[in-house]
Amino acid sequence: MGLHKLRLAAAVPVTFSSRLFLKPFTNTLTLGLFSRHLQPRNKPLLVRAFSASAAVQDIPATQTSDSSVAARPLWKAAIDFKWIRDNKEAVEINIRNRNSNANLEAVLQLYENMVNLQKEVERLREERNNVAKKMKGKLEPSERERLVEEGKNLKESLVTLEEDLVKLKDELQHVAQSIPNMTHPDVPVGGEDSSAIRQEVGSPREFSFPIKDHLQLGKDLDLIDFDSAAEVSGSKFFYLKNEAVLLEMALLNWTLSQVMKKGYTPLTTPEIVRSSIVEKCGFQPRGDNTQVYSIDGTDQCLIGTAEIPVGGIHMDSILLESALPLKYIAFSHCFRTEAGAAGAATKGLYRVHQFSKAEMFVICQPEDSESFHQELIQIEEDLFTSLGLHFKTLDMATADLGAPAYRKFDIEAWMPGLGRFGEISSASNCTDYQSRRLGIRYRPSEPPQTGPKKGKANLPATKFVHTLNATACAVPRMMVCLLENYQQEDGSVVIPEPLRPFMGGIELIKPKHK
């Protein structure tokens, strides 16, 4: 059985350096099984003008044009272009507030071109049908010959315009998919510093002795081995040892047990998914600063969060209203390139390439998504309060929202070793942004039958569901919090009481004596 060579696509800084490399690189780095490569950005498709009408206009100058042709999209989002056109000002402000690079003018111009071209196609189809009808009657030979020639010309023109229409629709999708979700009206406008505190729980622990960070604690207690992992896998990988392994399992099992009590169905997920699923969930699997590892030579990626495979479970489906809400708590390993991450604030377990996480995911009716968002946040806050953490919940500002999020709350916990708060979870309401891309709809309960005949035509129209996601437990950062906050003067670490039954009754991680 041959060994497949994986080349993991991830944008890296040009100034990247590592002890593994002796000279600068350009496009591709090969690390035995793994490598990272830079993807060229797709150039906009040149829309071919048609001579039968002036419906197709030039794309705005902000759209770069060259001789390259954008690849046809492998999937299409059900974007409401008419709504975008009718609410241009609101969409424009939203794009600006979120610091998005979406090109609204290009989208609107392409949409207008498409509408005009569709009208022209429909006009030619009607003319061709009229010619066909005339051909059925009794005609003089000369008239029949003229109609045959006219029908032939119309067919050729129609084929050309239909090809143009397909290309125009593809380019419209290509450009429009960069438009972010709209934003909740209560979200603060600005950068991360503009985020509003929803609440703050507890207070920083006061230590009467010099404190250690989790790296030193992990070394002294023989819990974490970064050096061996760096030799085996590279930087930002780690081994957990001894009680740290039990602590990870305890965190996950306790979290799952608590969240399941709220009616969430437990899942484990695939950790390799198709790139299209990553894109449909609102992540960029390739390009500058991607956080996604792509498997070269395939259409697959390693997941950065269980949100992605869980979102794909009901892809291209119509759910019954009675089946909603669907609430999941999913365990997975997560893989992130952490491109651009550096500095003391990201050292140790705080920012790593591979980690375990439990993720909550909700599929619901649109009118229920805000209440489920509050439920997710409350579950997170209850979990962290039970573990005795000092944390604050932030309503994140517009510029800190990812493309799918309508609103996002982050929770930051106090990390004594860092001397600051660090993010440990987030909860996002993505409304119908993901469902329009994943094709997840539901059919409202059928109203009383009033017509004489019951049939498909009488069924209520389907609607797009809303999706939400929230972190229940990101293991490495939770371990940072617990090790640093529960350290004792003698070098030991106390295990929070809720976790002890899941660690065989262990109450204390003690220094190892050689």
UniProtKB/Swiss-Prot annotation:
Q: What is this protein called?
A: Serine--tRNA ligase, chloroplastic/mitochondrial
* Assigned EC number: 6.1.1.11
The pathway entry for this protein reads as: Aminoacyl-tRNA biosynthesis; selenocysteinyl-tRNA(Sec) biosynthesis; L-seryl-tRNA(Sec) from L-serine and tRNA(Sec): step 1/1
Q: What is the predominant subcellular site recorded for this chain?
A: plastid
Check the record and name the InterPro entries matching this protein: aa-tRNA-synt_IIb (IPR002314), aa-tRNA-synth_II (IPR006195), aa-tRNA-synth_II/BPL/LPL (IPR045864), Ser-tRNA-ligase_type_1 (IPR002317), Ser-tRNA-synth_1_N (IPR015866), SerRS_1_N_sf (IPR042103), SerRS_core (IPR033729), tRNA-bd_arm (IPR010978)
Q: What is stated as this protein's family in its record?
A: Belongs to the class-II aminoacyl-tRNA synthetase family.
Q: Where is the organism placed in the taxonomic lineage, from the top?
A: Eukaryota, Viridiplantae, Streptophyta, Embryophyta, Tracheophyta
Where does this protein come from, organism-wise? Arabidopsis thaliana (Mouse-ear cress)
UniProt: ATP binding residues: 336-338, 352, 423-426
Q: What reaction(s) does this enzyme catalyze?
A: tRNA(Ser) + L-serine + ATP = L-seryl-tRNA(Ser) + AMP + diphosphate + H(+); tRNA(Sec) + L-serine + ATP = L-seryl-tRNA(Sec) + AMP + diphosphate + H(+)
Keyword Chloroplast among record annotations: yes
Gene disruption: observed consequences: Lethal. In heterozygous plants, aborted ovules.
Gene name as annotated: OVA7
Localisation? Plastid, Chloroplast; Mitochondrion
* Domain comment quoted from the record: Consists of two distinct domains, a catalytic core and a N-terminal extension that is involved in tRNA binding.
Described function: Catalyzes the attachment of serine to tRNA(Ser). Is also able to aminoacylate tRNA(Sec) with serine, to form the misacylated tRNA L-seryl-tRNA(Sec), which will be further converted into selenocysteinyl-tRNA(Sec).
One GO BP annotation of this record: plant ovule development
Please provide the record's keywords in A-Z order.
Answer: Aminoacyl-tRNA synthetase, ATP-binding, Chloroplast, Ligase, Mitochondrion, Nucleotide-binding, Plastid, Protein biosynthesis, Transit peptide
The subunit structure is: Homodimer. The tRNA molecule binds across the dimer.
Record's keyword annotation contains rRNA-binding = no
Q: Name one GO molecular function term.
A: serine-tRNA ligase activity
- CC terms in the record's Gene Ontology section: chloroplast; cytosol; mitochondrion
Question: SUPFAM superfamilies per the record?
Answer: Class II aaRS and biotin synthetases (SSF55681), tRNA-binding arm (SSF46589)
Pfam families from the entry? Seryl_tRNA_N (PF02403), tRNA-synt_2b (PF00587)
Indicate which residues the UniProt annotation says bind L-serine: 305-307, 359, 471
